[in-house]
Amino acid sequence: MVDATAPKKRTFKQFSFKGVDLKDLVEMPTEEFTKLCGARVRRRFSRGLDSKPMGLIKKLRAARAATEPNERPAVVKTHLRNMIVVPEMIGSVVGVYNGKVFNTVEIKPEMVGHYLGEFSITYTPVRHGRAGNASSKFMPLR
């Protein structure tokens, strides 16, 4: 019989990417990681990375090395919206440019394999249903 007064143990879902645990994913080389990804990501990495994405990764490494353990690293600003999030970037803080401002994005494990631009919206969503000039002209004036 289970004791009714005992607190329930909470179980948290462990993150895994295509069956690979987070700990193994972070230690995995990029070539091995690309084999787990979809065709678009594999194609992007097989064609090679030029100096700009590698420069971003170097800046993220430097920002992480400059911080103490269990602290948030400094924000690294970038215009590279087409950069694919790799496991090495998990825990970093990136300022992604949306055409106007840099939106601060903390890289979480669920973001692996997605583009940075997906996390920094470039437009203001439309708000429908608000009274504007056209609908207010039928209001009686005092």
From Swiss-Prot:
One of its GO terms (molecular function) is structural constituent of ribosome. GO terms for biological process: ribosomal small subunit assembly; ribosomal subunit export from nucleus; translation. Keywords: Cytoplasm, Ribonucleoprotein, Ribosomal protein. Pfam families: Ribosomal_S19. SUPFAM superfamilies: Ribosomal protein S19. One of its GO terms (cellular component) is cytosolic small ribosomal subunit. InterPro entries: Ribosomal_uS19, Ribosomal_uS19_CS, Ribosomal_uS19_euk/arc, Ribosomal_uS19_SF. It is found in: Cytoplasm. It comes from the Eukaryota. PANTHER family: RIBOSOMAL PROTEIN S19P FAMILY MEMBER (PTHR11880), SMALL RIBOSOMAL SUBUNIT PROTEIN US19 (PTHR11880:SF2). Belongs to the universal ribosomal protein uS19 family. Component of the small ribosomal subunit. Mature ribosomes consist of a small (40S) and a large (60S) subunit. The 40S subunit contains about 32 different proteins and 1 molecule of RNA (18S). The 60S subunit contains 45 different proteins and 3 molecules of RNA (25S, 5.8S and 5S). Component of the ribosome, a large ribonucleoprotein complex responsible for the synthesis of proteins in the cell. The small ribosomal subunit (SSU) binds messenger RNAs (mRNAs) and translates the encoded message by selecting cognate aminoacyl-transfer RNA (tRNA) molecules. The large subunit (LSU) contains the ribosomal catalytic site termed the peptidyl transferase center (PTC), which catalyzes the formation of peptide bonds, thereby polymerizing the amino acids delivered by tRNAs into a polypeptide chain. This is Small ribosomal subunit protein uS19. It comes from Candida albicans (strain SC5314 / ATCC MYA-2876) (Yeast). The gene is RPS15.
